[in-house]
Structures are given as structure tokens and as C-alpha cells.
A protein has these predicted regions:
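Hydrophobic faces of well-ordered beta-strands that scaffold small-molecule active sites
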Residues: 27-32, 61-64, 93-97, 120-122, ...
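Acidic (Asp/Glu)-rich catalytic clusters
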Residues: 19-24, 48-58, 78-92, 107-117, ...
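Active-site gating/metal-coordination segments in enzymes
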Residues: 4, 73-149, 345-348, 352-368, ...
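Divalent metal-dependent hydrolysis catalytic cores, especially in the metallo-beta-lactamase
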Residues: 30-33, 37-39, 43-71, 92-100, ...
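Active-site environment of divalent metal-dependent phosphoester hydrolases
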Residues: 35-37, 68-71, 101-104, 127, ...
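Mid-to-C-terminal alpha-helical segments outside catalytic/metal-binding sites
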Residues: 1-26, 30, 49-52, 57-60, ...
Length: 380
């Protein structure tokens, strides 16, 4: 296997991850993909393992199919590929079966669970379904009977998701992973499912403010690290998750829960640790200079992702230029060190973006990391 080298600019992110996490070999990425998507994204086994190796040679991941053109009938072919890839990964990958509620989901789910699938993936936007249906209820019954978690897309493109909360309340024994921090309806989920014993939220979120708000509303014991490969990178996602976790006041054992131990428990059929109260205040002071830089970076990221997969890193660069102008402030005050670090990451992102589309996600990862620093630095 050829390990993709970590771009030099990621070295400071990698160093901070080392400071914030004692055992990187225990990292478990809750949300990765393999195969081909209709949007053009693709990822093969060796490259996924290479991305995990950038974290640690022992890092692991949950994995499932993309919105594969070969998904009919019943996602059978993509599910078989994922099962085979996981078997070849020597214990580093936990395969989930992807199901379409409109295409024989129970028979396919039973088949995959019998072959070793460790969970179920549902994507209500891609498969255009709701949760107030007999098929959705039957899938929850399947997960309950099989003792496996369900990971559900709860990010962009979704309407209000109260029907899913209703279903979760009817099945308290089913472990749910709400992907993308449940940003489609985060406040509703955090309120209505606060007492659910096994609902967790993954951290594959592009906005640092959504991630901070997740830690402000949800106990640390209910948050699990995720990168959404191939749309993200584990090392960048882990940096963002751990930095926000530290900002939220999590100590080393709590950060270890987020990085892998909580997801390990769900996969083993155990309840996550008892929840503690979030410690991030609802109202938080910000440094105006860092807020300006961070706002430009969020706008740039939206422009890049709005271009459609694969993302166009060149579209973020006008906003990067504005953020770098903020970083050149001749009187930066207490924000000076953070602005200097942000400027270094953005300069490296410009260099990667100039190398072409193969480096686009690495460039965008650096922009995201810079945004996380802007949002979490404690300068006043």
C-alpha cells in the first residue's frame, strides 16, 4: 500500500492532535465511504487506509457505500464491495450496509448482517424518503434485533426531521449516529432526544460554529469523531474535532471518548458512558479580528462546495485573500499569534490550490483548519 504523504502544511495540525490525544491508535472515524458516487467522487481501499495512516497505523473507521451508480437492486453490489474491502483491511474497517427503504431493505439488511456488516447506513436525501413509513420502522426493528447501530444523514438538504425523532423515541434500544452534527435540525434533536440512551452525533461538519454549538448543546459522551472521507480528510477532521473539544473544556479522557471510545462501545453493543452537562456557554466572547477572518473563510468554503463535487478550491481563494488581509493587520493586538498561524495555513492552501484538482481537498482542509483556529482562539 502506498501511503499518501501528509502535506507539509499539515504538520502544525498533526502536532496539535498529538498534544490533544494520548493514543492515536485508538482513533475510530465513524463516517467514511468507499466506492463510486454519482457525483464523481470515488475512493479505493488503499487510499482510505492511507488517509487513516496519516492519523496512525492503527486508526480505524466505519465504512459504507456512496450513492453508487450500481446500487440497484437493493445496494447489493456496493454492499458486497464494502464487505470485501473491510475483510481485506485486517480489522481496521467496520462495514455498514447501505439500505434503500424503497428497494427490498429488510432482505438486503439481513443478508449483509449475516455476512458480517456491523451497522446500517441510511441517506434520506439521496434516497428521497421520510421516516414516517412502515419501511423505516421495519429498518429500526432490524437494527434492534441485530444489535447494530444506524448512521443517518442529518446534514444539508434535509427538511425538518421530527419524524426521525419520533421513531428514535419509539426505539430507545437502537443506537443512532446522526451524521454531520445533525445540522439539518440540531436544536430539535438535542432537545427532544436529550434523554435517549444511545443517540450520538458525528463531527463531519464544515462550520466550526456548528461544531462548537454541538458541544454546547450535547454531552461530550454523545459526540463521535467523523471525517466523511472522501469529502473530508481524517487528519483535518480530527484536528477540528479535538480543538473544539478542548475549547469546550473536555479533558484527555473525554477527548478519547470522542475520538473513538464511544463509537467502539456502540459497535460492541454497549451503551455509551453516562452523559455529563455541556460546559460551553451559550453566549461566547469573540475577538473582532479573528471573527472577520473566520467569516471570510466560511464564505469561501461555501463557494468552493457550492461548485459541486469535486470541490473547486480556486473558488475559495478570493475569500482567502480577504482573510489574509485581516492577518496583515499592523496592530493585531492579542490576536497576533493566531492571525500569524492562520496566515501560514492560508498561504499553504493557496499553494496547494495552484497545483490543481488533485490537491483541492487538501487546500480546503487547510482553509477549514484556519477557520477552526479563528473560531476557537481565546485571544481577547
Amino acid at each position: 500500500m502506498v501511503v499518501e504523504p501528509l502535506p507539509e502544511a499539515f504538520a502544525t495540525l498533526d502536532a496539535e492532535v498529538r498534544e490533544l490525544l494520548d493514543d492515536r491508535s485508538a482513533v475510530l472515524d465513524a463516517h467514511t465511504h468507499l466506492g463510486l458516487d454519482e457525483d464523481g467522487q470515488t475512493l479505493e481501499l488503499d487510499r482510505l487506509l492511507g488517509f487513516l495512516d496519516q492519523v496512525d497505523a492503527g486508526a480505524r473507521a466505519c465504512v459504507f457505500a456512496l450513492h453508487d451508480p450500481d446500487r440497484r437492486p437493493a445496494y447489493r453490489t456496493p454492499n458486497d464491495r464494502v464487505l470485501a474491502w473491510a475483510a481485506a483491511a485486517e480489522g481496521r474497517l467496520y462495514p455498514f450496509c447501505r439500505l434503500d427503504p424503497a428497494d427490498d431493505p429488510i432482505a438486503e439488511g439481513k443478508r449483509c448482517l449475516a455476512l458480517g456488516a456491523r451497522g446500517i447506513k441510511l441517506h434520506p436525501r439521496a434516497q428521497a424518503f421520510g421516516f414516517d413509513t412502515p419501511a423505516a420502522k421495519a429498518i429500526f426493528e432490524l437494527a434492534r434485533d441485530g444489535g447494530v447501530p444506524i448512521l443517518i444523514h442529518a446534514g444539508r438538504g434535509m427538511p425538518p426531521m421530527d419524524a426521525l425523532a419520533d421513531l428514535a423515541q419509539r426505539f430507545p434500544e437502537v443506537a443512532l449516529v446522526l451524521a454531520h452534527g445533525a445540522i439539518a435540525d440540531q436544536a430539535m434533536f438535542a432537545t427532544r432526544l436529550a434523554g435517549h440512551p444511545a443517540v450520538v452525533y458525528d463531527t463531519s461538519i464544515f462550520s466550526p460554529f456548528d461544531l462548537i454549538e454541538l458541544f454546547a448543546r450535547v454531552p461530550a459522551e454523545r459526540i463521535v469523531f467523523a471525517s466523511d472521507v472522501p469529502y473530508g480528510r481524517p487528519i483535518a477532521g480530527l484536528f477540528a474535532t479535538l480543538r473544539v473539544a478542548a475549547y469546550a473544556g473536555l479533558d484527555a479522557p473525554e477527548r478519547a471518548l470522542v475520538a473513538g471510545a464511544t463509537m467502539d462501545a456502540l459497535l460492541a453493543g454497549r451503551a455509551p458512558a453516562a452523559p455529563t452537562a455541556p460546559r460551553v456557554p451559550a453566549v461566547r466572547a469573540v475577538n473582532g479580528r479573528l471573527a472577520r477572518a473566520g467569516a471570510y473563510l466560511l464564505m469561501g468554503f461555501g463557494a468552493a462546495m457550492g461548485s459541486g463535487p469535486p470541490p473547486d478550491a480556486t473558488r475559495v481563494m478570493p475569500m482567502v485573500a480577504l482573510a489574509r488581509a485581516v492577518c496583515r493587520d499592523p496592530d493585531p493586538g492579542a490576536a497576533g499569534p493566531a492571525l500569524g498561524r492562520i496566515d501560514g495555513l492560508l498561504a499553504a492552501a493557496e499553494g496547494l490550490a495552484a497545483q490543481g484538482s488533485d490537491r483541492a481537498l487538501a487546500a480546503i482542509g487547510l482553509v477549514m483548519a484556519a477557520g477552526v483556529i479563528a473560531a476557537t482562539d481565546q485571544s481577547r
